[in-house]
Amino acid sequence: MRILVIGASGMLGSAVCQVLPRATAISRGAGNFDIDDLHIDGYDWIINAVGVTKPMAQRDDLYRVNAQFPRDLANASERAGARVIQIATDGVFSGARGRYKESDPHDATDDYGRSKSLGEIHSPNFVNLRCSIIGPEPHEPRYLLEWLRRQPPSATVRGFTNHLWNGITTLHFARIVAGIVNNDLAVPSVQHVIPTGAITKANLLRELARAYGRTDLRIEDAEAPESIDRTLITERPDVNAALWRAAAYDQPPTIPQMIDELV
C-alpha cells in the first residue's frame, strides 16, 4: 500500500508522517502546489494536509489552496484510482449557535470559512474529516499551543470564557487517518470527528499550560466581544466511534486526555 502526504512539513502533515512513517512526504509552501507536479499515479491513499489558515490568510492563496486545489486533487485522484483523506474545518460555521452537525448549512462570512467550504469535495473517493485541531508546530510558530508555550515566565494571558471548543490534537487526527488507511474503513464524504466533551478556550489554555509544565502562567478569565461556539456534533455517532476504535480507543477520548498524550 502506497500513501502520499501532501503538506508534510506543516503542523498537521508532520504529525501524520510521524504516525505513518512509510508514507511519501511532499513538503512545499502552501501556495506552491500544482496538481500536475505531484505525480499521484500509483498511490492508494492521498492525505491532503495542506491549507492556508487565518493567521496566514491572503485572499488569493485562500481560494487557490483551500478551494481550487482540493477540486483538482479530487479529479486527479479519481483518474488515478486513489482515495483522498482531507481535513475539513469547523470554520465553515459562523459560531453563532454551536452543536453543528454534518448537514447543517455553512454560514461562515469570512474568506477563510468560505474557501474551506468550497474545498469540501463530495465524491466517492474523497473523505472530509471535519474538526478543529491544535498541536505543536515544527517550524514557525503561529497557533495557540506554541503561542502559549513561548510566553515569558510568569506571564498573564487572557482566556475567553465565551469561546467553546471540542476539537482534537494533530496527533489524534493522525491516528484516525492511520486507522482509516490500515483498516480500509468506509467513511462518508463528510464526517465530524469529535472527542468526549467540550471546553472553553480559557480552560483549554489551562490544560495546555498544565500538560506542558507552564504552571507559572496566570490564565485570566475574559469575555471576548463576540461569543463563538463552533462545537460539533455528529449525525453518525456510530461512525465517529468506529473511527476512534480504529485509532485504538474504546471510546472517544476527552480533551485533557488528548493533551496529556500529546506531550
Where are the language model's segments positioned?
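N-terminal Rossmann NAD(P)H-binding glycine-rich loop of SDR-like oxidoreductase domains
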Residues: M1-L20
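SDR active-site strand-loop-helix element
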Residues: I6, I46-V50, V84-D90, L129-C131
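NAD(P)H-binding glycine-rich loop region in Rossmannoid oxidoreductase-like domains
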Residues: D34-D72, A76-E78
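Conserved Rossmann-fold NAD(P)-dependent oxidoreductase catalytic core, especially the SDR/UDP-sugar
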Residues: D72-T109
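Active-site YXXXK catalytic motif of short-chain dehydrogenase/reductase
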Residues: Y112-K116, R130
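NAD(P)-dependent short-chain dehydrogenase/reductase
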Residues: I121-W165, L171-H172, A178-G179
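Conserved C-terminal active-site "lid" loop/helix of NAD(P)H-dependent oxidoreductases
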Residues: T170, A198-R206, D221-V263
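Mid/C-terminal beta-alpha module of Rossmann-like enzyme folds, strongest
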Residues: A174-G179, N183-R230
